[in-house]
Amino acid sequence: MRHEIWNEIRQQAPLIHNITNTVVANFSANGLLAIGASPVMADAIEEVAEMTFVSDALVLNIGTLGTMTEATMIRAGQAANEAGCPIVLDPVGVGATSFRRDVVERIMRHVRVSVIRGNAGEIATLIGVDWAARGVDAGDGACEPRQLALEAAKRYGCVVAVTGKEDMVSDGHVVMEVRGGTKRMTETTGTGCLLSAVVGACLAVEKNALKATVTAMSGYAYCGELASERAEGPGDFPIHFLNALHQLTQYTIPTNRIEVSTS
């Protein structure tokens, strides 16, 4: 965890290109603005490569797949690879349908991603572990999140973050557990998707993907806890959460929230 990342985001205002789903676009954009990043939500296939070339990170989120989504994401992803731009993939609901699984497989075949961020059910699907996923929700399975993160990172050669009751991040060599968060984050749509965007912002200023991801998740969880203390319910939680993100540079996040283990 490198807390200075939050100050660097605010100083540099990195441009984060999001090809994301229609449910969360507004929340993700506001969350990025809250931490000092600059969001752009360009998803027309005619312009995504050009937009990616001028961006500092690319976030691909398959939440609401359309007929052109796959081609658009691959074109943007290849442009990012050419430009040396880090990529975050959020495989929302990948276990729900064969269509989603096939799309993610083809994206991964053509694009080198820096970080995959998903819930346990989504990551389990990617590595072929049986899991009772429910739509875009995590569902239940027998494999530990720690093992899911480690095996997925080894398979795809990138950092993998598994979020849920237990948050795990792995680069295929070490696994880092990030403690914290609140159940309220599951009662508001888009909190996971915004986390992926925040990981992208951290990657824009910190090229070590493991360090950037752990920092993003730790700060994000801490803001969730602060917002939960101030909110009366799911209606005003997003407001307090965005405020906490905006004030993140002022907080001292306890260092004992991270536990490291080797593979």
Swiss-Prot record:
Primary enzyme class: transferase
Q: In which pathway does it act?
A: Cofactor biosynthesis; thiamine diphosphate biosynthesis; 4-methyl-5-(2-phosphoethyl)-thiazole from 5-(2-hydroxyethyl)-4-methylthiazole: step 1/1
The protein's superkingdom reads: Bacteria
Q: What does it catalyze?
A: 5-(2-hydroxyethyl)-4-methylthiazole + ATP = 4-methyl-5-(2-phosphooxyethyl)-thiazole + ADP + H(+)
Q: Which UniProt keywords apply?
A: ATP-binding, Kinase, Magnesium, Metal-binding, Nucleotide-binding, Thiamine biosynthesis, Transferase
Q: What does this protein do?
A: Catalyzes the phosphorylation of the hydroxyl group of 4-methyl-5-beta-hydroxyethylthiazole (THZ).
Which residues are recorded as binding substrate? 41, 190
NCBIfam families per record = PRK09355.1, thiM
Q: What EC number(s) does this enzyme carry?
A: 2.7.1.50
CDD domains hit by this protein: THZ_kinase
GO CC entries: cytosol
Q: Which GO terms describe its molecular function?
A: ATP binding; hydroxyethylthiazole kinase activity; hydroxymethylpyrimidine kinase activity; magnesium ion binding; phosphomethylpyrimidine kinase activity
User: What's a single GO BP term from this record?
Assistant: thiamine biosynthetic process
Q: What is this protein called?
A: Hydroxyethylthiazole kinase
Tell me the cofactors it needs.
Mg(2+)
Assigned protein family: Belongs to the Thz kinase family.
Source lineage: Bacteria, Bacillati, Bacillota, Bacilli, Bacillales
Identify the residues that bind ATP: 117, 163
Q: Note the Pfam families from the entry.
A: HK (PF02110)
